[in-house]
Each structure stands twice: as structure tokens, then as C-alpha cells.
């Protein structure tokens, strides 16, 4: 097996599985308690990843922040920002000023095309990143799940309904029930009105060769930053 970081994928969704309204708006699906939990978990990661679709749509800061708005952990302990996708990072993007860049000797966020996710993760591992937190969006989460390179998911479930086409996940490479991905729920928590479900993915699950490289289809979505 190719060495890679431990990969945690996070998303927020409504009860009917939507990550955004039909017009693309998504702030906020979950409440303050759930968002605070996300930031505490970000602080435990070495790197934080977002797709260019979400980057361009939301301009997320990708920092681990306290309720007051300040940094939850010092700059040198903040997760290093990683961007995946072919589109350029805008010059005025917030992550260009990410506090973790200078302490880690970086002048800009790390960026990968997303054409080979296994190779991307191997490179991150070689750079010393052991824990990767995936902040969004649905295209990135779906591609990583399809490539079978995710260790656990954090699903923040809001007691609300949106309907429409903007689902939390897209195609994850499963065509029939015989290929269903079984997860093990390892933790649940009530966070205000919302529910956190933490589930681990069975490392023994079969990996289809057609899924070892699953390019990301770039779209627009929310990181719930």
C-alpha cells in the first residue's frame, strides 16, 4: 500500500442529504456548536484540503479558529492549506495569507491537479503530513471516497430540509448494492440542534483498480468555513 496521511473527510448536510440550497447558498446549514466542533478538529490536523470549486465560491480561510474569531492554536500549529483542482488560486484569496504558510517555509498553499489522488496523498505523506482534514466540497469528498483513500468521515447532520440538486455527495464509484461501502459508526454527539456522526471506513474493503485514480470534477460548493 502506498503511504499516505490519515484522511478525514467532513461535510455538513440536511436530513435529506443536501449540502446547499438550489441557488448555491449554504451558510449556515449547521449551528455554532457544530461549527465550533469542526474548528477543534481542524486544529488536530497537519494539513487541510479544499477543492478549487469551493475555494472560488466561498473564499474560505481554512484556519482553526476560536469562537471569538482568533486562532484556536498558534500559527505554527495551524493545518497547512492544500488546494486540489486545475484552476488557479486567486491572488486575493484568504488562504494566500494563511498563518501556517510562513512557519512551514511556504510562500503559497500547496496545490495539486487532482488527476491522481493516490499520488497526491503520497506526496503529502513524503512532506511529513500525517493527518489530512478534507474541508470540501462535495466533488472532492466524492472523488476521495471513490478512490478508496478515506479513513473516516465526519457528518454534521442538521434537522432541516432543502431539496434540490446540491447533494452532499456525488458519484463515489458505486453502481450497485453489491459494491456498497459499509462504514462503522464510532462516535455520535449532539451539538446544539445538530448531530455529529463519526464513521470509520473498513480498511479491508475491496478496492477496484478502476478507482485508484479518480479525477475530481471541479464544481462549486461550500466548505462550511
Where do the protein language model's features map onto the residues?
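Active-site ligand-binding patch in enzyme domains
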Residues: 2-133, 139-142
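Intrinsic-disorder/low-complexity, polar/charged segments enriched in Ser/Thr/Lys/Arg/Asp/Glu/Gln
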Residues: 6, 152, 194-196
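Preference for bulky hydrophobic residues occupying beta-strand positions
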Residues: 9-11, 155, 199
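Structural signal for conserved beta-strand scaffold positions within catalytic alpha/beta enzyme cores
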Residues: 83, 111-113, 155, 187-190
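Conserved histidine-centered catalytic loops in small-molecule metabolism enzymes
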Residues: 117-118, 172-225
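Generic C-terminus detector
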Residues: 124-133, 142-150, 159-164, 196-199, ...
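Short, loop-centered acidic/histidine patches that primarily coordinate divalent metals
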Residues: 137, 156-159, 191
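Flexible, gly/pro- and Lys/Arg-enriched active-site loops
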Residues: 147-183
Amino acid at each position: 500500500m502506498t503511504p499516505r496521511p490519515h484522511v478525514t473527510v467532513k461535510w455538513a448536510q440536511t436530513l435529506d442529504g443536501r449540502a446547499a440550497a438550489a441557488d448555491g447558498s449554504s451558510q449556515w446549514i449547521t449551528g455554532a456548536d457544530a461549527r465550533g466542533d469542526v474548528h477543534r478538529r481542524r486544529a488536530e490536523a497537519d494539513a487541510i484540503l479544499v477543492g478549487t470549486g469551493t475555494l472560488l465560491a466561498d473564499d474560505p480561510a481554512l484556519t482553526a479558529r476560536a469562537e471569538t474569531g482568533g486562532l484556536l492554536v498558534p500559527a505554527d500549529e495551524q493545518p497547512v492549506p492544500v488546494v486540489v483542482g486545475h484552476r488557479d488560486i486567486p491572488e486575493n484569496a484568504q488562504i494566500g495569507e494563511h498563518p501556517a504558510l510562513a512557519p512551514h517555509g511556504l510562500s503559497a498553499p500547496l496545490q495539486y491537479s487532482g488527476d491522481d489522488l493516490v499520488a497526491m496523498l503520497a506526496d503529502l505523506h513524503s512532506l511529513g503530513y500525517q493527518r489530512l482534514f478534507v474541508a470540501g466540497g462535495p466533488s472532492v469528498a466524492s472523488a476521495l471516497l471513490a478512490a478508496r483513500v478515506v479513513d473516516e468521515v465526519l457528518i454534521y447532520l442538521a434537522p432541516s430540509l432543502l431539496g434540490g440538486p446540491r447533494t452532499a455527495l456525488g458519484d463515489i464509484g458505486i453502481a450497485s448494492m453489491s459494491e456498497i461501502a459499509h462504514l462503522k459508526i464510532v462516535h455520535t454527539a449532539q451539538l446544539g440542534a445538530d448531530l455529529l456522526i463519526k464513521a470509520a471506513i473498513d480498511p479491508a474493503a475491496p478496492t477496484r483498480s478502476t478507482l485508484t485514480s479518480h479525477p475530481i470534477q471541479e464544481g462549486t460548493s461550500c466548505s462550511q468555513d
